[in-house]
Structure formats: structure tokens, C-alpha cells
């Protein structure tokens, strides 16, 4: 029984990973085809076929790739439901709160939120959300910041180094992956 449950659990993980990959690829294609993306300070995407359980992950990926607040919406029954993610220093909750008259429900915090609205309110939400973000985001908040933990010599990057680094797993919010930099490296 235990092996069967474990196998089923792994199947769910793989299914979620496939959904994540497929939806992220679809979202990136939509973003690439958007007119005027360079002039927008936010990304809001709606696709009624996307899986509700993965939209938060996709919103996070869009924020990482394009470094803008992102909202990803899908259809749940007769409502558009979604997840929002933000960039460092920008309060996405306030941006969503600014649109509250268009929403049925919302909640969250500075960097992540959930929301629901009538499907017919999605176009107005996209414009209102963009309005707030454009008026309130600072230029430096739209550029990715890479915090380097340490400089290391290239010759110190060895299999033993990676083996030692693995001992610090698991990485996550309270134990971030370290970021190192080295100099004078060329890609031929």
C-alpha cells in the first residue's frame, strides 16, 4: 500500500511539473506576442483552460523572467480566479486592492495574492492593474537584482565544491541557494 501511495504521489508531482512546463511555455508565447509589452509595467494573462493548481507557479516564473508584477488567471466555474506575484519592493496586494470594485474576493500580502472576479471584468482589471503599477512602481524595481554571496576563484569550482554545497540542501525561503561570482571566464 505504501509503495502504491508513493507511486501515486510521484505521478501527481510529475503531472504538476508537466502542467507547469506547458503552461509556462504557453504564457511565454502569449507574452512574446503582446503588442507594447516594452511599455507595460505589469503582465496579466487569462486562459480559461489553465489548471488552477499551477497558476501561482506560472505567475512566479513570469515575474522571474520579465521582472514585473504578474497575475495569471484561469476560469473556475463562472469566475476568473488567479494568483499574483511581485518583484522586490513593490506591493502587489495594494495594486490588487486598487482594483477591488472589479473583484469578488482577494487576499494576500506584499509579494503574493489570490483573487477572483467575474470573467467579464478581466479586461478592465488588466487595464486598472497596469494603471496602478505604472503609477507606483519605481524604475529600479523593474530590474532584477542579483545578490552575490561570495566571490570565488574559478579554480575552486570543483566536484568537491559541489559536493560540499549539496550538504546545505534543502534550499528554500529560509535557506536560499548561495550565489557566487568569479572573474575572467570566457565562453568560446
Question: What is each stretch, according to the model?
Answer:
Residues 18-45, 98-188:
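Mid-to-C-terminal polyanion-binding domains and interfaces
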Residues 2-121:
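Hydrophobic helix-and-loop "lid/oligomerization" segment in the mid-to-C-terminal part
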